[in-house]
Amino acid sequence: MPSDFTLKAANAVHRALLRISFGRWGTEFYGMPALELTTIGRKTGQPRSVMLTAPIVDGDDYIIVASRGGDPTHPAWYHNLRGTPTVEVSFRNGPRRAMTAHILSAEQRAPLWSRITADYPVYGDYQKRTTREIPLVRLTPVTEGA
């Protein structure tokens, strides 16, 4: 399982790659589209950003995986969006958009998890490393007047 240092370093490198290439590189990772998720820190109240992949893009919705490489604990961003589900997302280095995070129920998760692990088996490997069920989160655009 990756250490906090490794995860933070990988995020910094990913952001730097996007920045120095003016978005030409780093918009995909392992064949999945990349996005930058900004949550509000549950303890600090400050914006916190992380680079993630979206193994499923469903129209304007993105499905993200709270795997943390199969670590026994959920990633910090997952805890943050549980507290404040309104987030900002920059998809493939595009403009930031307000979105709402919906943690999927077991029934909603099952067909999507099967699809994700069929297309990207590494997620199945992550699940084998941990006893926790790896959550899936659907990000949906905030609609006007909502």
Describe the function of each predicted region:
Residues M1-E28:
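Extreme N-terminal tail/first-helix region
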Residues M32-S67:
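Short beta-strand segments
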Residues A34, E133-L136:
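Short hydrophobic/aromatic beta-strand or adjacent loop that forms the aromatic wall/cage
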Residues R68-Y120, R129-E133, P141:
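Short, structured beta-strand-loop surface elements
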Residues Y126:
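Non-catalytic, usually N-terminal nucleic-acid engagement modules in DNA/RNA processing proteins
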